[in-house]
Amino acid sequence: YETAADVVVIEPGKDLQVDLENLEKALINHKDRRLKIGSFTACSNVTGVRTPYHAMARLMHEHGGVAFIDFAASAPYEAINMHPENPMEKLDAVMFSPHKFLGGPGSSGVLIFDSSLYHSKVPDQPGGGTVDWTNAWGEYKFIDNIEIREDGGTPGFLQAIKTALAIELKNQMNTEMMHEREKELVALAFRKLKKIKGIHILAENITDRLGIISFYADSIHYNMFVRLLSDRFGVQVRGGCACAGTYGHYLLNVSHDKSKRITDKINLGDLSEKPGWVRLSLHPTMKDKELRFILDAIEEIVKYHPVWKDDYIYDKHTNEFRHKLGTTHNGRIDSWFKLT
């Protein structure tokens, strides 16, 4: 919807997982389209559930399309293979955000694509260092090298260095070892959360996932839950729909009519009925005792929420909760920004 493309959502199959038959049906229905781009996520940033992206790429290629895979959620923990043994399963483009890697904040985004896809004669963002020459009569020639031509202005040297270091750290940690550790953490979290009355895990039937667990609680607003975890226990999690509003309609079984009622209110500035959840991210470096502390905190919030919630005021325009005493900080923070 952000481009000139017609977006086709592939309906999920059983248990909301990828249905390759539905993908093929969509490709057949659009066989007359000259350009067919399969833009898929490698892993959900809401449930941690992986997708069969190589099989999806094969279907795209069999029907004359290309496959672009978003590894934002899984790149810090999983290997990325753009050229598997079967050439029909190759990935035409991948993208990921190194700032999600351990040690990655401050790095730049990464896009890797098959150069045969590039046909533009003018860079997306013209700037310094993108031309071989110019003259006094308005003539010029852009640099042939795609990477240089598309990197106008001063390159992000520090960002690139940090990206490389974060990837190297990932390689040293070993993806197989990280996977094994995440399995242990996910199992521990599932055992505890399933015992807490009123807690509902999204896609709880799938335990083979990355260390991403999203849940909601009966009668507790997700942003209230987030605020209490932070204020009472010093634990930071994310509340909302995690940039996955469309997926959220399936996860929370939101009908078109209900969605319309909610979005109409949002358009009027009232976010009070906007659906969402609490996302807990488990990292391979976490210790068991750290995770147990978080899980115990979740249980405490469920138990004492009826009392603790009275300390907060809800703003329907921001969908946030603020403490009645206001937000305060000690003077030490101010000193960070003083030059003398």
Residue ranges and their predicted role:
Residues 1-340:
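Pyridoxal 5′-phosphate
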